[in-house]
Amino acid sequence: MGEFINPASVPKVTFYNGVEVPCVGMGTFGSDRFTPEQVSGAVAGAIRCGYRMFDCAACYGNEDQIGQVFQDAFDEGVVERSELFIMTKVWNDMHERVEESCRKSIADLKCDYIDLFFIHWPFPNYHAPGCDVDSRNPDSKPFSAEEFIRTYRQCEELVEKGLIRNIGISNMTIPKLEAVLPLMKIQPAACEMELHPCFQQQELFDYLNDHKIQPIGFMPLGS
């Protein structure tokens, strides 16, 4: 029970496979404005308030600190692992080493599995932390369905190994989805997309729903 919100009263959506997920969660991207300690402190407060879904990512640079908050909450009896829905993502430079990335996130987040594991971006182009927003990687490559499916296959293996429960995709477009969906063995449970009143992406939203892929909006208040 949260101190301000009863988690059981939060509306839920149901994935195609029957998994229920809270409709409201907390993102943990601190950008350059908030330190890992500030973000993890906010996570601690959110858990006590009643939040049960947390959207993390390897590239955010704060999973270790957030994991300590999760561990403290488990140890103090504030919440059990089964009550949390923890999401994280493989970053662009780890597309060939997805299991390594996943295992590091599991270790950092102090949990024995990930509820929803995303491919953060559909291409392997890498930008170092702290780089200028206008910088360009000379080794950048365009989207390749073959490269993406190689990465996705590794995620499917993580499901088989019990490291993750569901696979997510992120920052996709309809043409990209049409190229890769027929090649997948395990259907993606969700697609994370920028979604707010100023950028509604209605066509993509409808496409995902038609294919039983749950849209998840990031930056819901705009950015």
What function would you assign to each model-found segment?
Residues T14-N17, G67-R81, I106-D112, L181-M184, ...:
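Acidic (Asp/Glu)-rich catalytic clusters
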Residues M26, A46, F54, I66, ...:
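Conserved, mostly hydrophobic/aromatic
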Residues Y51, C111-I114, I164, P188:
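A structural motif
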Residues V98-I119, E157-K161:
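CE4/NodB-like, metal-dependent polysaccharide N-deacetylase domain
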